[in-house]
Amino acid sequence: MALSLIEEKKLSRENLTQNDIDYFRKKYGKKFVRALRVVEENKVEKYQFKPSDTITWIVKGRSRQYLVIPKVYCTCRSFYQEVVISRESNMCYHLLAQQIAELRAQYELVDSTDTKRRKLYVEWRRTDWLLIQH
């Protein structure tokens, strides 16, 4: 689920060339476009909790915020369905957005406390999309 070193180098540049954009669109399709838009709209947050120095990445999606463990996991439905169950993809656009944001240092840094982290995790770890609506 990680980007290749070549991809990381391309994304680390200040400006993407048209060739770079074409490459990523061909490889990742709409996911790249959505991920880049999320980054450009400043919807990626890096929380740093004190005193533990725990880092948590959040990507704001269309309907809620998603907890992202870089290169590993996302709490969104797409990750569960496309990556875990059907294995038709190796990442959702939230994971891609987090990697792009980190490489480009284009994210909001949020300082908070460990006490607040416990409360936030209750919301972030929600998987109520799995529940059947009554």
Please give the residue ranges for each predicted region:
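Long, low-complexity, compositionally biased intrinsically disordered regions
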Residues: 1-134
